[in-house]
From Swiss-Prot:
It comes from Latilactobacillus sakei subsp. sakei (strain 23K) (Lactobacillus sakei subsp. sakei). This is Alanine--tRNA ligase. SMART domains: tRNA_SAD (SM00863). Keywords: Aminoacyl-tRNA synthetase, ATP-binding, Cytoplasm, Ligase, Metal-binding, Nucleotide-binding, Protein biosynthesis, RNA-binding, tRNA-binding, Zinc. Belongs to the class-II aminoacyl-tRNA synthetase family. Consists of three domains; the N-terminal catalytic domain, the editing domain and the C-terminal C-Ala domain. The editing domain removes incorrectly charged amino acids, while the C-Ala domain, along with tRNA(Ala), serves as a bridge to cooperatively bring together the editing and aminoacylation centers thus stimulating deacylation of misacylated tRNAs.
């Protein structure tokens, strides 16, 4: 077998399909762009949905890619099996309505078996097909020449995730030999496609030819597609003859580096240790790429997944004897392994290391955080007069802080509480069910819109240079059908040329009107989006008859566009100013450009201080007042990068790109509309800055007239406050507010003193009744206070004054009874425990409880039982 590196295999795959007329699509960011159904990009086809559901028509219907992907559905299996990974690469070739089975099947065989390419032994390959897919069966047998006994019909070979595109698929298996197997040769599962380790699936070709309708019916799609997927890690393990994916050049450098950081553990010596080595190597790849693509550790969403992976790796490091921070040291190794196709990892190495190191340091505090949450949970349960920690709370401790259920149960028992084990298991099962369903939910696709797909009109955008264009109306769509004319209602229009900007890149669509050549307004443009074939599709409210083929005048609202261009140019200035103040690690994470305000999301590890925010704002205004020219140039992507233009990692760029340059200060790739000069913006004012997720911040701002209005409104508000507070000038407001705060603090202090004095008077009355109970002095009383907090205060005073050996107090709040028991040290030594006593008397008030030997509490629902409970306490001690 050929000796090939993983980098060579990846490149050979792309080169093979490039020779077959495919465009090579660069690997997209792991963070989905404009796809709310996905947490992560989890397959090669996930980034191509817009082509397959017909929203966009690709320049070339033949596409190939090597797509980095993350799946965490089966995270508990990582390290325990030969092939489960959180991060992996999918090699894929795709046809959007072009070639089909007759080409896809022979090409797969050629790539795998040809000596020019991978050169696998054809005798070790088997395929599976859907029983009803006679075409695929025929092609494998007649065109490829595969023997019938190596074509296995499997009922599960039908790709269907609910509504949307679906179809039969064909899988290719490599026979690794019986020595790799985990079942006997005569086992019924010992066949390609069965549950065994001998036959390894290396390629899956999906023939997407049907559309699954909501009513369950399957109809043929207007355009049939090919969607293939081959895991790079699997294919490399076959080529490098590795026992599992982990013994390949994609993982072994990471495993070896981890072993070098362990005092005494080595890979291959102990099965349990090997699992930890594999988990660390796998998770190091996932977190490195995820952070590089803009994800940050957090307590929800993809940030939570990231945090869980880092902490899981750290815990496995501890099992290997690695107690210091180490995960961040694996980042450059990941970068070196993958640099031939993903050079950006090494370019961002310092930032990725910083994020992981920070998370490792933070994790040391996590167990303490977990303990604090557990204590708060226990206190809350007691305050509600309950005796059980619910399953959801126990699961949160496990899921967020890594607290094993056994540890939570142990702490609860010390406090006289129990844990809802059944509820915990229910939460665990629900999480696993969500994980199982995630793949099908995430991969859902919309159906193709044949009407829009069939619109082939060439449409030119003229809006960079003019706001009014005369153009021929080429297509009218109403009621999901092409029309020759339209007289009323809402319609969608395509013109041969238009000045209207279609929504893209965070910039909203233009608004305006359409006039006939007589000057009459015939429609109002309310929205503009791109049609599947790339034309601006105008959504309009029709006022007068419009006829296909007739010329009209399209006019963009100049006030609307004027506000948009100012705010869009401001986002470019803001982006560069943030980099100048916070550092080059800061990246744009999203934006919204409206005519009256702008929103800008960016990555940053910590909060932005008021001083930093003020500096950013000052820089932007300085550039506005410097009257810098705004120029644009079209060039190829490589030239743009050499010029130093900033590109967004979430964007995909074509061969020709537009560079927007603001003086010598800012240069970005951007297809939006902009001001001609920064002086057009007039003024820039940040209105808010906040965190919208771990490592992601959001700035909202206004420019020009909106900025003036914002500042003027603030002045009006200050004047109103000054009037209400009887202050002559607004500059004196801070001093007045400080005075009011000091006065309030003094009043609060006096109030607390009065409450304490009242509590002492109450305590004196409660503690007067000391009675003998056997050999012990007992205070047992209905304290008649507000609730459990007040009972605890009384118990604290009792402990300080050492009034008796045992204290039993009760009170009623509404229909709830609260009980507290406290025991002095000498009585505890003699065997009297607060937890035992509370368990005896709590049932008499219709409740239960528990606690420590020195203090316990309970709740109940039977106020009438208080006298019996107090009497029972005396009997218990007698």
């Amino acid at each position: 077998m050929k000796q090939l590196t993983s980098a060579q295999v990846r490149q050979m795959f792309l080169d093979f399909f490039k020779e077959k007329g495919h465009d090579v699509e660069p690997s997209a960011s792991l963070i989905p762009d404009e796809d709310p159904t996905l947490l992560w990009i989890n397959s090669g086809v996930a980034t191509l949905k817009k082509y397959f559901d017909g929203r966009v028509v690709p320049n070339n219907p033949r596409i190939t890619n090597a797509q980095k992907s993350i799946r965490t559905n089966d995270i508990e299996n990582v390290g325990k099996t030969a092939r489960h990974h959180t991060f992996f690469e999918m090699l894929g070739n795709f046809s959007v309505g072009d070639y089909f089975k007759e080409d896809a099947i022979p090409w797969a065989w050629e790539f795998l078996t040809s000596d020019k390419w991978i050169g696998l032994d054809p005798e070790k390959l088997y395929v599976t097909v859907y029983p009803k897919d006679k075409d695929a069966h025929r092609i494998w047998h007649e065109k490829v020449g595969l023997a019938e006994d190596r074509i296995i019909e499997v009922e599960d070979n039908f790709w269907d995730i609910g509504e949307g595109p679906c179809g039969p698929d064909s899988e290719i298996f490599y026979d690794r030999g019986q020595s790799f197997n985990n079942v006997s040769e005569d086992d019924p599962e010992n066949y390609p496609g069965g549950e065994n380790e001998r036959y390894l699936e290396v390629w899956n070709i999906v023939f997407s030819e049907f559309n699954h309708l909501p009513n369950g019916e399957y109809v043929e799609q207007p355009h049939k597609n090919i969607d293939t997927g081959m895991g790079l890690e699997r294919l490399v393990s076959v080529i490098q003859e590795a026992p599992t994916n982990f013994e390949t050049d994609l993982f072994m450098p990471l495993i070896e580096a981890t072993a070098a950081m362990s005092d005494h553990k080595q890979y291959g010596q102990n099965a349990a240790d090997d699992i930890s080595f594999k988990i660390i190597a796998d998770h190091a790849r996932a977190v490195t790429f995820a952070i590089g693509d803009g994800a940050m550790p957090a307590n929800e969403g993809r940030g939570y997944v990231l945090r869980r992976l880092i902490r899981r790796a750290i815990l496995n490091g501890k099992k290997l004897g690695i107690n210091d921070a180490f995960m961040y040291k694996l980042v450059p190794i990941v970068g070196e392994i993958m640099h031939s196709y993903y050079p950006d990892v090494l370019e961002q190495k310092d930032f990725i290391e910083k994020v992981i190191r920070s998370e490792e340091d933070r994790f040391r505090e996590t167990l303490n955080d977990g303990l604090r949450l557990l204590n708060q949970t226990i206190e809350a349960v007691k305050a509600e007069n309950e005796t059980e920690i619910n399953g959801a709370d126990a699961f949160k401790l496990f899921d967020t802080f890594g607290f094993p259920i056994e540890l939570t149960t142990e702490y609860a028992e010390d406090e006289g509480l129990t844990v809802d084990q059944a509820g915990f298991e229910k939460e665990m099962a629900a999480q696993k069910a969500r994980a199982r369903n995630a793949r099908s939910d995430e991969q859902s696709m919309g159906s193709q819109n044949e009407v829009l797909l069939n619109i082939k009109t060439k449409s030119e955008f003229t809006g960079y240079s003019e706001l009014e264009t005369e153009s021929r109306l080429a297509d009218i769509i109403q009621d999901n059908a092409e029309q020759e004319s339209v007289t009323t209602g809402v319609a969608q229009l395509v013109f041969e040329a238009t000045p209207f900007y279609a929504e893209m890149g965070g910039q909203v669509a233009d608004q305006g009107i359409i006039k006939n050549l007589a000057g009459q307004v015939v429609a109002e443009v309310t929205d503009v989006q791109y049609a599947p074939n790339g034309q601006p599709l105008h959504t309009v409210k029709v006022l007068k008859e419009m006829i296909s083929g007739v010329h009209y005048t399209l006019s963009v609202d100049p006030t609307f566009r004027g506000g948009v261009v100012k705010n869009h140019t401001a986002t470019h200035l803001l982006d560069q100013a943030l980099r100048d103040v916070l550092g080059e690690h800061t990246h744009q994470a999203g934006s919204l450009v409206e005519p009256d305000y702008l929103r800008f999301d960016f990555t940053n590890l910590g909060q932005v201080t008021p001083d930093q925010l003020a500096e950013v704002e000052q820089i932007v205004n300085d550039k506005i007042w410097a009257a810098l020219p705004v120029n644009t140039v079209e060039t190829d992507i490589e030239t743009a990068k050499q010029m130093g233009a900033i590109a967004l990692f979430t964007e995909k760029y074509g061969k020709t790109v537009r560079v927007v340059q603001i003086g010598d200060y800012s240069m970005e790739l951007c297809g939006g509309t902009h001001a001609n000069n920064t002086s057009d913006l007039g003024l820039f004012k940040i209105t808010s800055e906040s965190g919208i997720g771990a490592g992601t911040r959001r700035i909202e701002a206004v420019t020009s007239k909106a900025a003036f209005k914002y500042l003027n409104d603030k002045q009006v508000l200050l004047n109103e406050l000054a009037s209400e507070l009887k202050v002559a000038q607004t500059k004196d407001l801070p001093k007045k507010i400080q005075q009011l705060q000091a006065d309030l603090k003094a009043e609060q202090k006096e109030n607390e003193q009065l409450k304490a004095k009242f509590a002492q008077e109450q305590a004196g009355n409660v503690f007067e009744n000391v009675v003998e109970a056997g050999q012990w002095r007992l205070v047992a009383a209905d304290a008649k206070v507000a609730g459990m907090n007040e009972l605890r205060q009384l118990a604290d005073q009792w402990q300080q004054k050492q009034i008796s050996d045992v204290l039993v107090l009760a009170t009623v709040a509404g229909d709830k009874v609260s009980l507290i028991v406290a025991v002095a040290p000498d009585a505890i030594k003699a065997g009297i425990k607060a937890g035992d006593l509370i368990k005896q008397i709590a049932p008499l008030v219709g409740g239960g409880g528990g606690g420590r030997p020195d203090m316990a509490q309970a709740g109940g629902k039977n106020p009438a039982g208080i006298p019996d409970a107090l009497a029972a306490a005396k009997e218990f001690l007698a």
